[in-house]
Structures are given as structure tokens and as C-alpha cells.
A protein has these predicted regions:
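Flexible, acidic/Gly-rich N-terminal and inter-domain linker regions that tether
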Residues: 1-51
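Short strand-loop junctions, especially beta-strand C-caps/beta-turns
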Residues: 22, 70-72, 110-112
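Short, glycine- and charge-enriched coil/turn segments that flank and shape catalytic ligand pockets
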Residues: 38-49, 77, 96-103, 131-132
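Canonical Radical SAM [4Fe-4S] cluster-binding loop centered on the CxxxCxxC motif
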Residues: 50-83
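Conserved, mostly hydrophobic/aromatic
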Residues: 60, 87, 109
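Non-membrane alpha-helical structural segments and their capping/turn regions in soluble enzymes
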Residues: 81-88, 119, 123
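A short, N-terminal amphipathic alpha-helix
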Residues: 87-97
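Conserved glycine-rich "GG(E/T)P / GGGxP" loop and the immediately following alpha-helix
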Residues: 98-132
Length: 132
């Protein structure tokens, strides 16, 4: 392997964690503009292909040595209900901005270990998402 090439790319880089990425964030975003943009993008995506959801479930009982995710290591499963209730409240905020029923094409569960959550709690979450 070329040592120069290795040294060139052996540097820390930011992880892709959000869109838009952090350098494009600013404090002057107007709520009305954001809501209008959300509605427009939602309608375009929903009519064309449906929407994809990413639900961040950050809990794990143990740490994987390779993990770079935003996670919380715990064996206390009492956090499940509180966290899922918060996700459902947030979903309802977004849902109130949608003028039509979302066509959900895919759901990605990630962050920590989705299997940290009981099957019953995951079912409650998915029912709340799909009942809208």
C-alpha cells in the first residue's frame, strides 16, 4: 500500500448523522417556512414513492466495540415506555402537518439495538405509526 495515500486519508472525519449536515444549521429558521417546506417535501415523496422513516432506538444492554452510534447502555428496561411515548408524540406532531395519509414504504429501526425493546412495545410503536 502506498504510505502517502494511507497518510492522506488516515484522518478523522465527521460522521454523516443528519440532513442537512450541521454546518448548514442556523438559528434563523422560520417556523412557517419550515412547516411549508416539510409539507411540500412530504407530498412530493408521498405521491411518488411513499416515505421512509428512521426511528432511533438508542438503547443497548452492552456496548459493541465497533459501535459509533448515539446510544445509551443500560439494562433497565423501564426506559422503553417513556422513550416510545416520546417518539409517538413527535410522530403526531409531524402527522399533524401531513395533509394526506402517509404511504410508509419502509421503516428503519436503529441507533442501539432495536431488540432491546420488548415485542409488545415495538408493536405499540408500529401500531401508532400505521394507525394514522
Amino acid at each position: 500500500m502506498d504510505l502517502q495515500l494511507l497518510m492522506k486519508y488516515n484522518v478523522p472525519v465527521p460522521r454523516y448523522t443528519s440532513y442537512p449536515t450541521v454546518p448548514f444549521w442556523h438559528d434563523s429558521t422560520d417556523l412557517n417556512w419550515w412547516q411549508q417546506s416539510f409539507r411540500q417535501q412530504f407530498e412530493q415523496s408521498n405521491q411518488r414513492d411513499g416515505i421512509s422513516l428512521y426511528l432511533h432506538l438508542p438503547f443497548c444492554e452492552s456496548l459493541c466495540t465497533y459501535c459509533g452510534c448515539n446510544k445509551k447502555i443500560t439494562t433497565f428496561h423501564g426506559v422503553e415506555t417513556i422513550y416510545l411515548e416520546a417518539i409517538i408524540r413527535e410522530w403526531n406532531i409531524y402527522r399533524a402537518l401531513m395533509e394526506t395519509k402517509p404511504v410508509i414504504r419502509e421503516i428503519h429501526l436503529g441507533g442501539g439495538t432495536p431488540t432491546f425493546f420488548s415485542p409488545q412495545n415495538l408493536a405499540l410503536l408500529l401500531e401508532a405509526i400505521f394507525e394514522t
